[in-house]
Amino acid sequence: MTENSTSTPAAKPKRAKAAKKSTDHPKYSDMIVAAIQAEKNRAGSSRQSIQKYIKSHYKVGENADSQIKLSIKRLVTTGVLKQTKGVGASGSFRLAKGDEPKRSVAFKKTKKEVKKVATPKKAAKPKKAASKAPSKKPKATPVKKAKKKPAATPKKAKKPKIVKVKPVKASKPKKAKPVKPKAKSSAKRASKKK
């Protein structure tokens, strides 16, 4: 009885300690964004430099490197970070919006507006062609199928009849021919000997 009572409260403080450790630092995604903003590199900051910044400014556990890798991949997939060099978690990264200067953003907006105006005209043409094409196809297909079916049935009926008749005719003359020449040749040989 005493052992059970002492073992149950021992598990609770462990959970409390784990909760305290997580509160020592913010989310890894927030720390990575802060590290990239602090470096202010146009080419982007590497994963190693991000790890150094996080370890020096925040109290992080031993598995911080693996957590940083995972959070970098998530930020790239969500579009928060852009990968300028390398593949996966290795390479250099920068923020998708924060690091770009204001002038480049203004130019990109004007380019996007021009593209948006041009695209609906191009998109409208293929839609018209696509709507016409399917209406023609279903009309043509049932007619072709109807023609093929009756044409195939008489061919199948004729072929087996021809196959059955041929071997019967061919077998009779073959048996009759070899018998006659033997009789003639034997008669000729007998006349020559005389």
Curated annotation (Swiss-Prot):
Main location: nucleus
Subcellular location: Nucleus; Chromosome
UniProt feature, compositional bias: Basic residues: 105-194
Sequence ranges assigned to domain H15 in this UniProt record: 24-97
Listed Pfam families: Linker_histone
Residue numbers of N-acetylthreonine PTMs: 2
SUPFAM superfamilies: Winged helix' DNA-binding domain
Domain of life: Eukaryota
Region (Disordered), start-end ranges: 1-26, 86-194
Keywords: Acetylation, ADP-ribosylation, Chromosome, Citrullination, DNA-binding, Nucleus
Transcription regulation found in the keyword field: no
Protein name (Swiss-Prot/TrEMBL): Histone H1.0
Gene name for this UniProt entry: H1-0
